[in-house]
């Protein structure tokens, strides 16, 4: 009877959101009914992205009870996120870009049901606008330098543009491409904005130390420090090897290394990858009572066939050291080989000494449609160590599983849509699920 009531509750909550979902899809289809493209005026390029989405997270916890699923409260909402950019022409190899962005719900959402949506700041919980990008770039065939605010992509500090609004960073970087197939990078991240991945108010730019996931006392000790980084990336389309090092001053160092062997043709292709990530405390944090000292070893095998079928597999082992809750997902980095589609790892008590496994199957309808349509089914399993991972009421946890279904669709000129549903089971907590319907158009 309890299971039956649970299923009825799920369907009731889904039904309660149907009007909002219908509104979302109506706006999306209206926007996509006309193909759009960037506008060029005397070398100045105007472009943009209008994104809209319905997100819903059911933790079986409508009142935010701290003894259920870490106190995470059921949340849902509809949002629209416009973004517009102006890129200058190149003058003596110099160019610049400015991007304005924002997010609003037009007052349609229930503020009491938005705490886990992470589109608005969870404390202020209101619409916002932001100067997302403003940078100057110098680029030649072998050199590139950039300073300013930019949606920048690296493995462990990333724009992470898979949700409603990407992360952006106040930064500087130099990239040398003198050697064939090789990129040598060095730079500094000073600040970050991004609601989903920031440990501070993500609707504004904050120092990298404030935007980290370490305890507030460690942030205060770091005193608005940034992150230095350097990288070597070699890629000849068969062998792709990369090593990145990130030094978060007074907090912790992150070493990321990955190798992929990639082969294939129109009938069959595959990617065999190995990854190593190490987190180690430095500076003032090293002398504090916060521990960050662990590594992750991972393998993957991904393959695709000419008939549209694909598989993606991964396995990861977390060593027996502390700090996973203070580092995983910080600053937008999600390069991990064995994650879920939505939930990833935040609902586990701890991933210390854990192991994870992923199996995904997909189908690309490229032979049936001129548009790009794909459907993917993923199952992720975490074997937890009950010595470290505990439920909200203190019980040890052995197992966390996630099963997700995702549909991706790109159509017309710039239209896109991603729908994702994932169910989440963990020992000694109620079953949870999440739904994301996100789409829009670029121009």
What function would you assign to each model-found segment?
Residues 315-392, 401-402:
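C-terminal structural cap/anchor segments
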Residues 52-54, 145-159, 184-186, 230, ...:
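Transmembrane beta-strand segments that form the barrel wall of outer-membrane beta-barrel proteins
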Residues 27-152, 172-178, 182, 264-266, ...:
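Beta-barrel outer-membrane channel/assembly domains of diderm bacteria
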Residues 1-42:
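Cleavable N-terminal export/targeting peptides
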Residues 53-62, 103-109, 150-160, 191-195, ...:
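Sequence/structural signature of outer-membrane beta-barrel proteins
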Residues 66-72, 119-122, 157-160, 215-218, ...:
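Extracellular loop and loop/strand-boundary signature of outer-membrane beta-barrel proteins
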Residues 76-80, 128-132, 165-170, 224-228, ...:
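Residues that define the transmembrane beta-barrel architecture of outer-membrane proteins
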Residues 182-227, 268-348, 352, 421-435:
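Outer-membrane beta-barrel translocator/channel fold
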């Amino acid at each position: 009877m309890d299971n039956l009531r649970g299923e009825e509750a799920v369907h009731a909550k889904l039904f309660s959101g149907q009007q909002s979902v219908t509104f979302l899809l109506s706006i999306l289809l209206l926007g996509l009914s006309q193909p759009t493209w960037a506008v060029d005026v005397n070398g100045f390029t105007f472009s943009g992205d209008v994104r809209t989405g319905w997100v819903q997270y059911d933790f079986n916890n409508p009142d935010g009870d701290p003894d259920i699923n870490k106190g995470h409260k059921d949340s849902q909402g509809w949002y629209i996120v416009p973004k517009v950019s102006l890129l200058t022409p190149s003058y003596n190899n110099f160019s610049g870009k400015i991007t304005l962005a924002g997010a609003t719900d037009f007052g349609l959402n229930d503020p009491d049901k938005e705490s886990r949506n992470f589109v608005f700041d969870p404390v202020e919980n209101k619409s916002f606008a932001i100067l997302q990008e403003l940078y100057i770039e110098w680029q030649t065939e072998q050199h590139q330098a950039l300073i300013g605010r930019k949606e920048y992509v690296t493995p462990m500090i990333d724009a992470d543009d898979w949700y409603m609004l990407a992360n952006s960073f106040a930064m500087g970087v130099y990239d040398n491409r003198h050697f064939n197939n090789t990129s040598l990078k060095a730079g500094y991240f000073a600040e970050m904005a991004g609601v989903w991945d920031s440990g501070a108010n993500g609707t504004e730019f904050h120092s990298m130390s404030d935007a980290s996931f370490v305890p507030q006392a460690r942030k205060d000790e770091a005193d608005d420090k940034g992150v230095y980084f350097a990288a070597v990336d070699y890629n000849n389309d068969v062998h792709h090897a990369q090593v990145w090092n990130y030094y978060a001053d007074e907090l912790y160092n992150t070493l990321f290394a990955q190798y992929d062997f990639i082969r294939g043709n129109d009938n069959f292709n595959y990617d065999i990858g190995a990854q190593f990530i190490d987190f180690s405390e430095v500076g003032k944090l090293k002398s504090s009572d916060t521990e960050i000292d662990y590594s992750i070893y991972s393998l993957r095998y991904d393959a695709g066939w000419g008939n549209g079928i694909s598989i993606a597999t991964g396995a990861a082992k977390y060593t027996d050291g502390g700090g996973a809750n203070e580092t995983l997902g910080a600053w937008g980095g999600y390069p991990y080989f064995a994650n879920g589609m939505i939930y990833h790892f935040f609902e586990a008590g701890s991933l210390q000494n854990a192991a994870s496994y992923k199996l995904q199957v997909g189908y690309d309808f490229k032979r049936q449609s001129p548009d790009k349509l794909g459907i993917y089914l993923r199952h992720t399993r975490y074997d937890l160590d009950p010595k470290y991972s505990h439920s909200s009421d203190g019980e040890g946890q052995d197992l966390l599983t996630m099963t997700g279904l995702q549909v991706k669709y790109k159509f017309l000129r710039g239209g896109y849509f991603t729908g994702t549903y994932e169910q989440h089971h963990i020992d000694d907590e109620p079953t949870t699920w999440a739904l994301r319907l996100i789409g829009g158009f670029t121009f």
